[in-house]
Structures are given as structure tokens and as C-alpha cells.
Amino acid sequence: MIQGTTSDAGKSTLVAGLCRLARRAGARVAPFKPQNMALNSAVTADGGEIGRAQALQALAAGVAPHTDFNPVLLKPTSDRGAQVIIHGKARMNLDARAYHDYKPVAFDAVLESYARLRAGYDTVLVEGAGSPAEINLREGDIANMGFAERVDCPVVLVADIDRGGVFAHLVGTLACLSDSERARVRGFVINRFRGDIKLLEPGLDWLRAQTGKPVFGVLPYLHGLLLDAEDMLPSQARSAAARGDAGVLRVVVPALPRISNHTDFDPLRAHPQVEFTYWKSGPVPDADLLILPGSKSVQRDLAWLRDAGWDAVIRRHLRYGGKVIGICGGMQMLGRTLDDPLGLEGAPASVPGLGLLDFDTTLQPDKTLKNVTGHLALPGAAAVHGYEIHMGDTRGPALAAPALTLAAGDASGGVRPDGAVSADGQILATYVHGLFDAPDACAVLLAWAGLDGAERIDYPALREASLERLADSFAEHLDLRALYAEFR
């Protein structure tokens, strides 16, 4: 089991790289995260929902994503509450205290999934959540040492040296553990190191002497990895490279407080002709394309946008010929009304949308979870592959001009419409995540948004190359013989 001294220490990436190394060695390996709290999620082959990081780890391992890889997923709906997803299906919304009482039920689901994976795979690589040293969360823990102790799993502790204080993080974490938990930690991995390793060696010697535990490796800081983030937004901006006469498209996405599935924009951030910005505050930069992203709490995030003046920003942008895309929750915001009669994303309410497309959305208790294929309803009809994760039922005249046609996914072999394109062709709305992943679709959408000579980039191939680069680095910098000796 890989645990970390902090959130974003490198647990997900370490598991992904080890999954790829195991695949290279011919082992059948399964990634596993008992409990994940994230708004980036993926649809599995068995029709459920798991954290995006586990889907990436499955790709690294060469296996189809399955709900057993992440049996408990918590999707925050507010600062104190979350939607609880068990074995891929939404069960209920709970506040923190109510979920604490529910944990025994969640732990049963965790143990069921783990037992199935142990029976079906050569190795299970487990990822912890946050830090095992959260004293206030120790009672009833199912994500870190509580799980490791229950199933007798050895632990490797990873820390991010780029944050500073790496030795305090490692030794301090051990100090916060019980004797049995401390003994379970077999050693350490130090992540994101830059500089001369010889200057670090005295610290490594001290760490070994202080703890009696080995350092399995020091991993270098790898720039430019294109890997799906578990939850944290990437750095604020990504500027296009200077390209002489080649065009550049300016894309701005509001960093909504409850933004979901922002991995939709990874292909744009990787595109050499796109100047990409996540906006949080202050004046909105000039843009050719504004994208309203998905949200786990659409009404609250729409109110946040309004408070920031984005309704006026969008209308001015359209008045001067700019383009707008709304994805999932962003699509719902573009309509006339947003109704949540059951309080699925907060208190029951009905609020006006931005009124830019003639449709209305009502949230329903049954969540749509589908992997989809289809074509853009734009010149060229480029192929699209993606997924739907939403609870919205959207209806209205604007849907008569769909943005995509999707395979119906049933025995009929037919197609179904999705989303809408405005009569003036400036607004495109869809429920489909992963809109920019397919190379041809990305190029067509960038051309629609105004980019002359849009290059075709193959983002899935770039992500695959990043996994290979990650595994190569691990093979060079980890003591794999010592690490594999801890596998059971």
C-alpha cells in the first residue's frame, strides 16, 4: 500500500508507474483505492463511477476500469457534505458526521472489492488517501492505516521534497502512528527531487538512522507529464509557444468552486496553439473561447459566476463574436432554468439559468453513467468518444439542433442527439465529457472556435508516452528488488 505524508505527495502517480512496470513484467495487477474524495471521475466498463486516478492506473496496468478499483467515492457537494458512491452507484448525500456513522457500511464494501481483486489478480497495488497522520480521522479510518491493519498490508510512505520539509514530513508522520502502524511502514520514497543527489545523501543517511527504515528511491521531478489529475487543478495558465505566423487560440475556463472533471481540458492545455487559463478572480482575460465546465453543485457555482459578473462577461464575449462551450453542468447553466426539486445538490430550489439556450433542466435521482461514441454535428462530423456523468434531464426547443449525434447504445444500432448548437453558431452545449480527447474532434472544435490551421494532436498517445516515461524513471531510480520483496 502506498500512503503519503500529505495530499498530492505523489501516491497516485507512484501507483500508476508501478502498475505500468508490473504490466511490462507480465503481471496481472489491479489498482485499488479504498476511499477517494474527488470530483474528477470516470465511467467504468461495468457501468459505474470511480475516481479518475484509478482509471488512469487501470490504463497503466492494461486492464479495464472497474468499480472494485475504487469502491467508495465521495464527491463533495459543499464544504461539509458529499455524495456517497458505493461500488460505482450514488447512494445518498451525507454531511461529515453522518458519513462517519456510515463508515462501517462503506468498509464492508471496501473489503468485498478487495477480496474480489485479491482472487482475480496477481498483485493489488493499494493507494491511501491524504495522510495516515490525521489524528482526528483515526477512529473508523477505512482509507489508510485502518485498511492496512485490517488486511495486514505492508505500507510504503511517499513524501514530496519539492514542498520543503521532507524529513519532518516523514519522521513526523511516523511519530503520529501507533506502534503497530509504524512497524507496518516498510520504507520511504522521496518524490519530485531536483538538484544534485549527493547533496541529499547526508539527509538520507540521517533518515535511515533515525527510523531504521530504508529509502526505496528518490524520484526526480519530471516536467511535462500529461497524466489525469485526481482532483487538484493544474497550474493556473499554460501559454502557447511562439509559433511565428501560426495562429493561437485563447481559451478561458472559470475555476468553479466545485468544478468537476476538469481533465476535459488536459488536451487543450497540451495543445501547442492554445493559450489556456483557469480564471479564479480579477478581470477575465481576453478570450476567443469561453468554456463553462462541469460542476457538482450547479446552482451554487452559477451563483458564484453571477457574483463575479460572468453573465455580463459571456454576453459581451458573444456580442463581439466569441464562442462559448458548456459541458455537462456548464451546459445546464446556459439554459433557462435549473430545477432541483429533491435537493440533490443542496437545498431544493429552482433558479434561472443564463438564458442563452432555449431549454430547461431538472435534476433527477437516477444518475446517467455511460461511455459514449459518436460524431460532432459540425462540418467534418469528426468522431467523438467520451462519457456522461450527470443527473440532469434537459428538455427544450434548442435540443432540435444537437451538438453531437451519439450511438444509441442499444440493439437498434441507431443514434441519439446530444446537446445543442445556438442558431447563430456561437454556442455549443453537450453532456459529453472528454470532448477534446479525440484528435480530429479537438481540431474541428478549435477551428470552429476560430483557430486557423489547427494542429491535430493525439492526446491519448501523449498520455501513453507519459506513462512510459514515468515507468522508465521508476525503473532507473527505485530499488525495485527491495520494493518487490514487500509484495504479497
Curated annotation (Swiss-Prot):
Record's keyword terms, sorted: Cobalamin biosynthesis, Glutamine amidotransferase
Keyword Kinase part of the UniProt annotation: no
Sequence ranges assigned to domain GATase cobBQ-type in this UniProt record: 248-441
Xref: InterPro entries: Class_I_gatase-like, CobQ/CobB/MinD/ParA_Nub-bd_dom, CobQ_GATase1, CobQ_N, CobQ_synth, GATase_3, P-loop_NTPase
MF terms in GO: ABC-type vitamin B12 transporter activity; catalytic activity
Residues in the signal sequence: none
Keyword Plastid: no
Active site: C328 (nucleophile), H433
Coiled-coil residue windows: none
GO biological process: cobalamin biosynthetic process
Pathway where this protein functions: Cofactor biosynthesis; adenosylcobalamin biosynthesis
Family label: Belongs to the CobB/CobQ family. CobQ subfamily.
NCBIfam families for the chain: cobQ, PRK00784.1
The protein's role, per its UniProt record: Catalyzes amidations at positions B, D, E, and G on adenosylcobyrinic A,C-diamide. NH(2) groups are provided by glutamine, and one molecule of ATP is hydrogenolyzed for each amidation.
Protein name: Cobyric acid synthase
